[in-house]
């Protein structure tokens, strides 16, 4: 809905950006299960530049606790191994030809709790981002009302709509967090 120069769909889009960022961050958290997204942040020194691992290899999950990295260029195998070791994911690569296998070790209880704390930190950052978007929207509404571009009633109604969108987005953040927390704590 657009009133004056206020567009609530733009606020929704910005809030969804925060939830997408959260999904991406949570996807990178290592749980006890193998996931190709675990290797997304890995950067490989390839051809004189840093490249994401997915640009030099194919990542697959043949078993629940095993990642398989098929390196396309045989000369890149050592660089990919080094990048995986240097990524601080706690994975030790074993190479068979052009395939690098990564066993995902079991997580102990202490590490699980640490990961849950990290997930909570990510979720809180997403909530803060959503609240910033809400504040921007409310500030815009106040400015429009002050400049007599919208009525006070419209401003209050739109502010209520902004709050509803904010509440829904924060609820989505909480659901993402709860799902990830359950995944982490599942032994």
From Swiss-Prot:
Alphabetically ordered keywords of this record: Cytoplasm, Protein biosynthesis
A single GO BP: cytoplasmic translational termination
A molecular function GO annotation: ribosomal large subunit binding
Top-level division of the source organism's lineage: Bacteria
GO cellular component: cytosol
Keyword rRNA-binding recorded: no
Localization of this protein: Cytoplasm
InterPro entries attached to this UniProt entry: Ribosome_recyc_fac, Ribosome_recyc_fac_dom, RRF_sf
Xref: Pfam families: RRF (PF01765)
Family, as annotated: Belongs to the RRF family.
Function, as annotated: Responsible for the release of ribosomes from messenger RNA at the termination of protein biosynthesis. May increase the efficiency of translation by recycling ribosomes from one round of translation to another.
Protein name, entry field: Ribosome-recycling factor
Organism the protein comes from: Rhodopseudomonas palustris (strain BisA53)
């Amino acid at each position: 809905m657009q009133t004056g120069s206020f567009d609530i769909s733009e606020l929704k889009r910005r809030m969804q950006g925060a939830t997408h960022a959260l999904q991406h961050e949570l996807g990178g958290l290592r749980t006890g299960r193998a996931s190709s997204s675990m290797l997304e942040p890995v950067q490989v020194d390839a051809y004189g530049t840093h490249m994401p691992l997915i640009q030099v290899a194919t990542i697959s999950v043949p078993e629940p606790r095993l990642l398989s990295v098929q390196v396309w260029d045989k000369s890149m195998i050592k660089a990919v191994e080094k990048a995986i070791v240097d990524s601080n994911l706690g994975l030790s690569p074993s190479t068979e030809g052009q395939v690098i296998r990564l066993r995902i070790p079991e997580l102990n209880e202490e590490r699980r709790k640490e990961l849950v704390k990290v997930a909570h930190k990510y979720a809180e950052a997403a909530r803060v981002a959503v609240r910033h978007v809400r504040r921007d929207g409310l500030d815009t509404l106040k400015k429009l009302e002050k400049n007599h571009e919208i009525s006070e009633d419209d401003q209050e109604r739109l502010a209520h709509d902004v709050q509803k969108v904010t509440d829904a987005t924060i609820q989505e953040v909480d659901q993402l967090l709860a799902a990830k927390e359950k995944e982490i704590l599942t032994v």
